Each structure stands twice: as structure tokens, then as C-alpha cells.
């Protein structure tokens, strides 16, 4: 006797709920930095409406309710409103805001929408919304290969990722500053000096080029500024790391904290690496 198949709740490649086209209002949003282009599929309405809005969540909700009213005038009782937009710099706030108001909101993985060769050549806002609409409709039907969704994190889950991401940015910034300082030394012919030393800034004025000259004044001032920036960045990195340790000590058994400590202990990685793995790789709500 074969075991019945169970639903994989973390399968974002297709929708697991049945789709009733006569009772479902479908909309996709093409987002830009200045406006939202909203395309809809409204039951009972032959035209497929397309509306450009200012970036205003209340105007979007009013538009959806207006389309719902149009469908109900045609005898279709709308029991489900499904909205989707591509993941991007706008984040997930709109999906959470819509969900709190009874709208089923999905965020499409930006690289997952199937694009035909013709659409690659001709790119317009209308084509973009058509592609999103086609991909979202296929996904709602439960068909694979149209697009994939990303899990919508809570505000707390998003915020929990900030320290690791900020630390990564700061580490990169510190590395770039040191590279710039070393490049300046190379241009002057100065070698064997470690700009990462704590006393590096105070020793700059004692350095001499192979020609026996001190570092020129403008270059010296720039080097001092870069080393001061590097000192500040390193201090910020230490603050993030200390805050992370304090949080783990306060609630070591809470949620992902236990997994962070387990990874750090079992596979021997640092706390920051373990936290990154838990938040960005192992979490089902990763973006």
C-alpha cells in the first residue's frame, strides 16, 4: 500500500490551494521608484484592466475593491483576492500590509519568471505586467515552471538579518579602505608598513619614501582620514559582534538562537558565521 503524498508547505514553486477563476480576483504589480502599474484579471469582465498608480498602498486597496465591485456586478462573488509582485528594493512591507487586510499577497522571485525570446527583445511596462500575470496565473493553477515565490518574512525576521548583513558590508568597507591605503604606499614606494596596526595613523608622519622625502601633505591628510574611517568601521564591527553575543546570552534557547549556538559548537564556526547560516541559508523565510 502506497503512502499518500503530503503537501510540502515550503514548496514555493506552485500554489497548493485550488483556484476558482470565477471567485478569484487576480492582480500583479509592476513596481518602479515613482509608480505602480497594476494589471488585473477580473471575473466576468472581458477587458483586462491596467492602472497606473502613485506609490500608495491605500490607492491600491481601493483599486482592488473597485475591481471586486465590478466582478460582483457581473454576478461573481469574490472570495479571494490574490496579488503578486516581484521581489526587489521595495522589500516585503506591502505584502504584509495587504495580508493584514485580507488580501492574499505573494512575492515572486525576480529571476524565476519564464521569459520568451520575443519578450527579451521587446521590453515595455505592458509586456512586464503580461509576463507577471501569465506566470502568476500558472503558479496559482498549481503548475510548475511558471515562477517561484519567496517566503514573506515578518518584520522581526527581516530585522534579525540586519546585523549579519550590516557586518558583512562593514567588513567589505574596512577591506576597501586598507586596500586604498596600501595602494597609496605603493605609489610612494613605501613598503613593509602595516596600516592595520593601532598606531598606524600616528606613525604616518615618520615614514619616508625611498627618495628620503616625507609623505606629501595632501596624501598624508587623505591617509589619516582613511585610517580614521577604518578605525570607526572596526569599532562598529566590534559593537555588532558584542550585541550579538549579548542577545544570545540573554535568550540562548529562544528560536534560532539555539541553532546558532549548536552550529557554533558542533561544526566549529564562529558565532557570526553560524548566525548568517541560520538566518540566510537554513531559514525557510530566507529571501
Where would I find each of the regions flagged by the language model?
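A detector of single, family-specific signature residues
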Residues: 1-287
